């Protein structure tokens, strides 16, 4: 696999939509090889919808026989989770009907999520705020998937890192900055989204596979000219992926703005977490946070709350050091905070922190 660290090695390359389409379809085809019942995680966002649509294309035939025989379970099952009326649930339902999957919609309540957080932190082994936020609904979803006898699911993780899909990428000043940030994001993925998907699912014995991170696909995707991936100003992110698969998806989904998983399951999930943790952690505790947690001192009350639970499960210093703890806006690296002066006083991983880009952005700065 070649991640193409150097901008110089890719800056003059082509960026063909057909190359992306062929490489991703091949990746999904490879990842579908399985002797157990499988399904797809369908959030209703672009990435999971693309993976689901491609999987549906191949689901009727056995991959192991190169399509020469019928699949043992030809009906593709898709799964979505969210608070009642969540943006993701509405779009996932639309995609499932369009591509023809057997769709399962799981509603959870904020209280169910809160009740699960202690177990979630134990299984995912991190106190990173965005990972805990997103892992909780995925953990609850995996429980349902396991109960139905599904052993493996395909998921859309990795696309935002490869194609610069997070909303803060709109602020990338140059193609070089854009490309170098995608490389940084990929190099840290095992501490964030891959950790979430792997451990939230495996806690219930479900295997997750991620075609966007297929090695052969990465060879193609990371060699694309970074300029073609950029989304300056109001341009939509991941345009090359949208153009490649627009004919396989409802138009409203193919051109839907990026919504992070922890936002898409329902805005009130994150808002309630912030309220609960703000009430649970006092100002005095935050003032003395460095005394209690000298390693990776929590940057806000929500992180302090998760860190306290983490310490109960994993009290050693080495465990604390294993978790990244840096300021972030919409899942950015610390380096990308320099892209916009408005980022410099922020520390909020939600995409709604990118004011002027997210359609439902916070009215005020979140610190």
What are these language model-derived features?
Residues 283:
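Non-catalytic nucleic-acid substrate-recognition regions in nucleic-acid-modifying enzymes
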Residues 1-3:
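Short, small-residue-biased leader/transition segments that mark boundaries at the very start
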Residues 250-260:
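Conserved S-adenosyl-L-methionine
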Residues 5-249, 263-278, 286-367:
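ATP-dependent adenylate-handling active sites, centered on carboxylate activation for C-N bond formation
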């Amino acid at each position: 696999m070649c991640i193409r660290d150097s901008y110089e090695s890719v800056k003059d390359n082509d960026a063909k939509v057909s190359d992306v389409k062929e490489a991703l379809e091949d990746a999904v085809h490879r990842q579908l090889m399985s002797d157990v019942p499988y399904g797809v995680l369908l959030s209703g966002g672009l990435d999971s919808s693309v993976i689901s649509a491609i999987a549906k294309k191949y689901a009727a035939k056995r991959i192991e026989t190169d399509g020469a025989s019928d699949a043992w379970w030809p009906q593709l099952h898709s799964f979505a989770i969210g608070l009642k009326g969540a943006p993701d649930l509405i779009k996932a339902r639309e995609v499932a009907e369009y591509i023809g999957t057997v769709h399962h919609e799981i509603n959870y309540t904020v209280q169910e999520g809160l009740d699960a957080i202690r177990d979630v932190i134990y299984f995912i082994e991190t106190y990173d705020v965005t990972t805990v936020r997103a892992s909780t609904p995925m953990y609850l979803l995996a429980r349902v998937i396991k109960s139905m006898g599904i052993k493996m699911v395909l998921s859309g993780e990795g696309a935002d890192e490869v194609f610069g899909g997070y909303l803060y990428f709109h602020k990338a000043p140059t193609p070089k900055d854009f490309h170098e940030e995608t490389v940084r994001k990929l190099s840290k993925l095992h501490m964030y989204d891959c950790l979430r998907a792997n451990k939230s699912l495996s806690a219930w014995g479900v295997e997750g596979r991620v075609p966007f991170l297929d090695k052969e696909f990465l060879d193609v995707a990371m060699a694309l000219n970074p300029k073609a991936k950029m989304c300056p100003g109001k341009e939509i992110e991941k345009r090359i992926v949208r153009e490649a698969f627009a004919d396989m998806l409802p138009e409203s989904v193919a051109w839907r703005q990026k919504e992070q998983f922890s936002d898409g399951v329902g805005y009130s999930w994150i808002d309630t977490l912030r309220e609960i943790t703000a009430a649970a952690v006092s100002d005095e505790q935050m003032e003395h946070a460095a005394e209690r947690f000298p390693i990776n001192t929590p940057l806000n009350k929500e992180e302090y709350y998760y860190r306290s639970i983490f310490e109960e499960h994993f009290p050693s210093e080495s465990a604390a050091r294993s978790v990244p703890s840096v300021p972030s806006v919409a899942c950015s690296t610390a380096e990308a905070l320099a892209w916009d002066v408005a980022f410099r006083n922020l520390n909020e991983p939600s995409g709604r922190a990118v004011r002027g880009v997210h359609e439902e952005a916070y009215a005020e700065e979140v610190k």
